[in-house]
């Protein structure tokens, strides 16, 4: 498997002048748009440059002016990531300048998959396979321009006056510089990837800097759009067909006896050990992991994001048996990590109930959509989420391997086969 969702560099920040290109995630009503803007001849003539930052305290004062439409590029989120990233992840922060003006910001993550056990408890046999050998030798050190902990385009935010092709070219040069920095530390990068973009946005990468990159897609991002007529959870239930109303009622009946509570900072800190146990119970049973969260991750997120980060505990007989986390990103609700006791999960349909609870939270609080992310595609579609294809770009550092990357990728990352469900009534029902 090639990990496409993709911390400890101490080198000084480097400034490199380059031509550059820019793209922007801009929050407008209910959707993310990709904008091209015309710039004056005077602005286009100014040199574009990039600067790589190792620490958030180095970021320019105007950083958050560009990040205001995406919490996952805000300084407070990046501070949390800097303080509580997975042990095998190295983050850098990139500013793109037109002259002295900051016109784009970006996040990069280096993942060293050789330093962790990527395969879950049920997949130990894969350690001996040819596939694992090829993965370890040729695709285990990855530089991601984006955020491997999330689904969607959280790589970059750009000023409305910047030129997209110039910003993208600057980011390409920043990626090259990062690879050189790691190489000087004895780390040869295998893969470089820009993630995740909608299919309509990939055309912006048609430029020489990306001509040798593989365009790829893996599991889709599952997104539930909240209909305007849904003013309550009951409205959502009423929109379902009989089969899925029955599924909803059955799951709620199974969950009787479970109490739910949103935990504050002190409660999250007090429950760190149990939260980690429940999280690892889920993660270790996944077929593949690119990282594992540290125990203090949720505590730090709550410290930094405050009310924008929500951790809801599920209790039975006053014992924590599961939890879910969510992050408020403007009018979009992003689901984050969760954990549960698998034996209780099966009996109480805990995971399905968590999905319903997140949907109810989004409806009650006026969100336009929920980002459910990848994995568990079929069950997420059964509560109304629809697949959105995300496209990434990938390039291998070996000029010999790179032309064969499509074959290599398809072998290590086979297409996921699943059946999409539609829980809502059709016009004929």
How would you name each of these model-derived features?
Residues 34-36, 270-273, 334, 350-352, ...:
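Short, flexible segments with low predicted structural confidence
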Residues 46-99, 103-124, 191-346:
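A conserved beta-strand-loop-helix scaffold within acyl/acetyltransferase catalytic domains
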Residues 1-5, 13-41, 145, 163-257:
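Acyl-donor-binding surface of acyltransferase catalytic domains
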Residues 18-56, 101-155, 308:
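Contiguous N-terminal and early-domain "leader" segments and peripheral loops that mark the onset or edge
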Residues 86-88, 128-133, 142-145, 228-232, ...:
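Low-complexity, flexible helical/coil segments
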Residues 29-44, 110-111, 153, 198, ...:
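Active-site/acyl-donor-binding loops of N-acyltransferases
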């Amino acid at each position: 498997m090639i990990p496409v969702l993709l911390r400890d560099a101490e080198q000084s920040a480097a400034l490199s002048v380059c031509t550059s290109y820019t793209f922007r995630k801009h929050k407008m009503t209910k959707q993310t748009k990709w904008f091209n803007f015309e710039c004056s001849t005077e602005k286009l003539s100014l040199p574009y440059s990039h600067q790589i930052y190792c620490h958030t305290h180095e970021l320019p004062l105007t950083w958050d002016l560009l990040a205001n439409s995406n919490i996952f590029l805000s300084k407070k989120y990046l501070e949390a990531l800097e303080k509580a990233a997975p042990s095998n992840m190295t983050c850098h922060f990139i500013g793109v300048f037109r002259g002295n003006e900051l016109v784009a910001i970006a996040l990069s993550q280096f993942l060293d998959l050789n330093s962790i056990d990527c395969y879950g408890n049920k997949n130990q046999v894969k350690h001996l396979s040819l596939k694992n050998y090829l993965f370890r030798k040729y695709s285990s050190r990855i530089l991601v321009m984006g955020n491997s902990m999330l689904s969607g385009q959280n790589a970059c935010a750009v000023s409305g006056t910047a030129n997209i092709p110039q910003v993208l070219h600057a980011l390409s040069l920043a990626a090259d510089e990062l690879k050189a920095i790691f190489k000087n530390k004895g780390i040869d990068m295998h893969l470089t990837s820009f993630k995740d973009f909608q299919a309509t946005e990939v055309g912006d990468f048609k430029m020489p800097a990306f001509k040798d990159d593989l365009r790829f897609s893996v599991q889709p991002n599952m997104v539930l759009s909240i209909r305007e007529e849904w003013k309550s959870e009951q409205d959502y239930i009423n929109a379902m067909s009989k089969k899925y109303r029955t599924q909803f009622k059955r799951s709620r009946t199974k969950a009787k006896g479970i109490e739910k509570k949103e935990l504050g900072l002190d409660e999250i800190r007090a429950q760190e050990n149990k939260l980690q146990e429940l999280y690892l119970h889920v993660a270790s049973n996944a077929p593949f992991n690119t990282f594992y969260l540290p125990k203090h991750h949720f505590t730090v997120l709550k410290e930094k994001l405050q009310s924008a980060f929500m951790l809801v505990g599920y209790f039975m007989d006053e014992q924590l048996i599961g939890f879910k986390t969510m992050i408020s990103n403007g009018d979009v609700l992003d689901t984050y990590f969760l954990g549960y006791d698998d034996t209780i999960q099966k009996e109480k349909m805990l995971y399905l109930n968590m999905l319903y609870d997140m949907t109810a939270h989004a409806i009650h609080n006026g969100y336009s959509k929920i980002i459910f992310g990848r994995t568990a595609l079929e069950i997420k579609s059964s509560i109304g989420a629809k697949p959105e294809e995300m496209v990434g770009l990938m390039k291998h550092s070996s000029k010999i391997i790179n032309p064969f990357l499509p074959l290599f990728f398809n072998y290590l990352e086979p297409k996921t086969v699943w059946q999409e469900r539609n829980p809502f009534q059709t016009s004929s029902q």
